[in-house]
Amino acid sequence: TSPATIETFGGTPPGTPEIRVISTAIGQPVPILQSVSHVPEGQKVGYSDAPPTSGEHWSRPASCGFYTENLPDERIVHNLEHGNIVVSYNFTNPAQVTGLRDALEDIELFDDWGVARPYDRIADGQVAIAAWGHLHTMNGVSPGELALIFEALAGVNGPERFTC
């Protein structure tokens, strides 16, 4: 593992050597914002990325699970700080929502480390998978790709590592 990988992932990635190699190629690293402190519940935060991958956030994270209603960025950033993975989706087709839910339900790590939510700040048909300081996007649902991302990144990033 190279020093850049260690810095990007906050330590040695888990899993097989193949997963460690794959984790360096998933998406792109995003610089951690300088301030990552708590702000009062309800206070809006201006993030440099949509969806955000770090920054100031509310003091209470979301429970793990699949949501069909909006979760504010300020809430899910706390999940990211805990090493959770946040899957943001923008689907107008209900079959795509069902396909994503089914794919995530098949990933054992999603129950303890994942939050999925609708998000209208990405293109229609897109999925954005965020971990602390890391962002991966894809068009549509790829169950195999989602499973690899969870295996490579769940519980790895974030200054605090707690399951939901």
How does the language model describe each region?
Residues 1-25, 151-164:
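Intrinsically disordered, low-complexity Ser/Thr/Pro-rich tracts
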Residues 7-75:
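Surface-exposed, low-hydrophobicity interaction/linker segments
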Residues 38, 57, 78, 82, ...:
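Histidine (H) residue identity feature
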Residues 50-52, 90-92, 121, 132-135:
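Solvent-exposed coil/turn segments that connect beta secondary-structure elements
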Residues 65-109:
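Mid-length scaffold segments of soluble, non-membrane domains
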Residues 103-164:
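Helix-rich interaction surfaces within compact, conserved domain-sized segments
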